[in-house]
Design a protein with these regions (language model features):
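Glycine-rich phosphate-binding loop used to anchor ATP phosphates in small-molecule kinases
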Residues: 64-90
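Short aromatic-enriched loop/helix-cap "lid" or pocket-rim segments at secondary-structure transitions
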Residues: 38-44, 89, 110-114, 120-121, ...
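Conserved phosphate-donor/acceptor-positioning beta-strand/loop module used by diverse small-molecule
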Residues: 92-115
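PAPS-dependent sulfotransferase catalytic core
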Residues: 1-68, 204, 250
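Hydrophobic/aromatic beta-strand patches that form the interior of the parallel beta-sheet core
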Residues: 3, 27, 97-99, 168-170
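PAPS/PAP-binding and catalytic site of the sulfotransferase fold
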Residues: 12-25, 88-93, 113, 168-192
Length: 250
């Protein structure tokens, strides 16, 4: 089975990969290069015919998944699955399982916004792209896009849901709940080991309720200053640049 996680980012997907690695024998990764971000993300979401560079990135992605699979099993929690490389994955594999990992939209928005403009901007869908399910007429600002992404990712999961072998709905608030993982493993038919509790170093502290801080208050003030400005599409580097950094040459 090939298991992927549909999520917006800022949902604990890295932590989930560490739990899979700890409790199962499935090769488990958070984000395996090529990430299929940047120009690859834009190309596959905005054009009917993808470029040679995008095809190459997807070929490398599928090759990596096959190479790192063990007995046909593989797990990756990369949020680009539902945004970008779902098309080649669904074409290449018949046994695709999907976890819908979701966090409430306001916390997701604040977590993205707190990181700031151009920190992960090439991992964000832009609302006016042609293949979006919830497409807007005009481009939006970065902060508007981060909120819109939450709804677009949800719609994309529902759009593909019946084509997955099995799915599982996983609430962010259950990231530290071992019983929830056991239910997930049993639903997917994955052998797993039980432990008394997650190691302290593995616990996701972001699950804990935290008060709104002055940092977030100042962030919202900054966002409000620009909220009504016209949106503008931002540019990306090619995904090929990232692949070269990992020693993959076209």
């Amino acid at each position: 089975m090939k298991i992927f996680v549909a999520n917006t980012g800022r949902c604990g997907s890295k932590f989930m990969a560490s739990v899979f690695e700890l409790l199962t024998d499935i090769p488990s990764y958070h984000e395996m290069a090529p990430y299929c971000i940047g120009e690859t993300l834009k190309d596959v979401n905005n054009n009917e015919v993808i470029s040679e560079n995008t095809r190459f990135a997807f070929q490398q992605k599928i090759a990596k998944i096959k190479h790192y699979s063990k007995n046909g099993d593989y797990f990756e929690s990369n949020n680009m699955f539902i945004k970008s490389f779902i098309w080649p994955v669904m074409a290449a594999f018949e046994d695709v399982y999907c976890i819908y990992l979701h966090r409430n939209p306001m916390d997701t928005f604040l977590s993205h916004a707190d990181r700031g403009w151009k920190f992960g901007y090439d991992w964000i869908l832009q609302s006016h792209w042609k293949k979006n399910l919830l497409k807007t007429k005009n481009p939006m600002l970065y902060y508007e896009n981060t909120m819109w992404n939450w709804f677009e990712v949800r719609e994309r999961f529902f759009h593909w849901e019946n084509q997955f072998t099995k799915t599982y709905d996983f609430d962010f608030r259950n990231l530290n709940n071992l019983e929830e993982y056991y239910k997930l493993f049993e639903h997917f038919g994955i052998p797993y080991k039980k432990i008394a509790k997650l190691p302290e170093t593995e616990r996701n502290e972001n699950v804990l309720n935290k008060p709104v801080t002055s940092r977030y208050e100042s962030l919202m003030e900054e966002i409000n200053k620009h909220w009504d400005n016209p949106g503008k599409e931002w540019a990306f580097d090619s995904d090929i640049k990232d692949m070269k950094a990992y020693g993959v040459n076209k």
